[in-house]
Amino acid sequence: LDDRAGCAMLLAMIREELPCDCCFSFTVQEEVGCFGGKTAAYTLRPDIAIAVETTTAGDLAGVPEEKKVCRLGNGPVVSFMDRGTIYTYDLYKRVRALADAHNIPNQTKEAVCGGNESRSLMTAAGGSEVLAISIPSRYLHSPACVADEKDIENTLELLRLLPEALAL
C-alpha cells in the first residue's frame, strides 16, 4: 500500500473539478534519497506541498505504548515533524482544525520517525510550505501491508477539502 494508497487518492482528486489550480506529482526514489521530490520542487515550484503517503502504525500487541506512532482506525495522520522535516506549523494547525470542523477523525504522529518527499520540497527551489498526511498502516514495506478502509476514506475526505481551504 505504501504509497499506492496515496496515489489512488490523488488520482481520484484529479478526476474532480477543483476550486483552484492544483498540481499533482507522483514521485520516485523516496526510499533512497527523495530525489523525485527535489525534481518536482524545481519543476513545479509550489507554494504549498502536501506529501500523501502511509506511515507505520505499530499498534500491535506487545509493542510498548511509546513505540505506537499512530493507530489504525483513528483517521489520517497529520504530522508535525519526522526525521527529515519540521512541517509548517501553521499548515499543521489549519489542517487539523479543518478535519475537526468537518468531523473527520485525525491523529498526529506520537513519535518523530520516518520521512518522505517533504524534506526535498521544503528546501529545493526556494522551498515551500510542507505537510504530510498519511494513512496509518501495519507491516509497512511488506507484501502484507494492512490499512483500515475507513482511514483511507477519511484521508480522501480531508484531502478533498484542502484545495479550497488552503487556496492562496
Language-model region placement:
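Alpha-helical metal-binding/catalytic segments enriched in His/Glu/Asp
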Residues: 1-31, 155-162
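Short glycine/serine/threonine-rich phosphate/pyrophosphate-binding segments
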Residues: 4-8, 33-36, 115-118, 142
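Alpha-helix C-terminal capping segments
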Residues: 12-18, 42-44, 122-127
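Hydrophobic/aromatic beta-strand patches that form the interior of the parallel beta-sheet core
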Residues: 25, 48-50, 131-133
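Acidic, glycine-rich active-site loops and adjacent beta-strand->loop/helix elements
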Residues: 26-33, 54-56, 137-139
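Metal-dependent peptidase/peptidase-like ectodomains
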Residues: 35-105
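Active-site-adjacent substrate-binding region
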Residues: 73-156, 162-166
